[in-house]
Design a protein with these regions (language model features):
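Bacterial N-terminal signal peptides
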Residues: 21-33
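A short aromatic-anchored loop/beta-hairpin motif
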Residues: 36-218
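Bacterial N-terminal signal peptides that target proteins for export
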Residues: 6-23
Length: 218
């Protein structure tokens, strides 16, 4: 059975449970051609042991074939996660920042952009090490956080950003009880949120590594 995801049309977005209305206050940008806005701060933590979701090798939904998702938020109202092993392309960091409205930067090198999930791929997120923090930063665990604002990219461009980061557009979302049902059917497995795997592992090896460390029982 395919993984249940939320459609991205505006009408349905208005009917989303509160957990997914987080998206409405996160930045809303067109890929490489928009401005970033500041999200509201939240202190909610995932209620699962993860925070990685690892897709079953037999998952029916092609969106999630051999996918590893960092579970950002989960409670009785639903769940939201960002895929960490689906690279799209590399872009010059200075060019990306300039198109997002940042000026007078000394940025060099490229930044790899990832597909965070099939829902609303025009919404951006930066998953990063917890050495960087702004008022809008969401702590995922003691070592990993998420920030969605133009400021973090400006800081990255000026070498004032986090030591480790991953830029993704889009997300995976579940309504109330959907993720729990898929975990029971073993559509997904839980694995510990390993810092090195999230930021340093070869992306081609992330799924295999996470799957080999999956938890068989919740």
């Amino acid at each position: 059975m395919r993984c249940v995801i939320l459609r991205k049309d505006i009408a349905l977005a208005r009917m989303m449970p509160p957990i997914l209305r987080l998206i409405a206050i996160l930045l809303s940008v067109a890929l490489f051609d928009a401005s970033w806005s500041t999200p509201a701060k939240t202190t909610d933590r995932t209620s699962l042991a993860g925070p990685l979701l690892v897709s079953s090798p037999s998952i029916a939904d092609p969106h999630f074939d051999h996918t590893v998702i960092l579970l950002v938020q989960h409670d009785h109202k639903g769940a939201l996660g960002i895929a960490i092993n689906l690279p799209l392309e590399e872009r010059p960091l200075a060019s990306l920042l300039e198109k997002l409205g940042a000026k007078d930067l000394k940025a060099t090198g490229n930044v790899r952009v990832f597909a965070g999930g099939p829902v609303q791929p025009d919404i951006g997120f930066v998953i990063h090490s917890s050495d960087y923090r702004q008022p809008e930063t969401v702590a995922i665990d003691k070592r990993i956080a998420m920030t969605s604002s133009r400021r973090i990219l400006q800081d990255i461009g000026n070498y004032k950003g986090p030591k480790k980061y991953l830029v993704a557009f889009g997300y995976a979302g579940w309504g109330p009880g959907q993720l729990e049902a898929e975990l029971e059917r073993r559509v997904w497995f839980i694995a510990a949120g390993d810092f090195k795997l999230i930021f340093d592992e070869d992306r081609d090896k992330v799924w295999e590594s996470a799957y080999s460390h999956r938890e068989e029982d919740l």
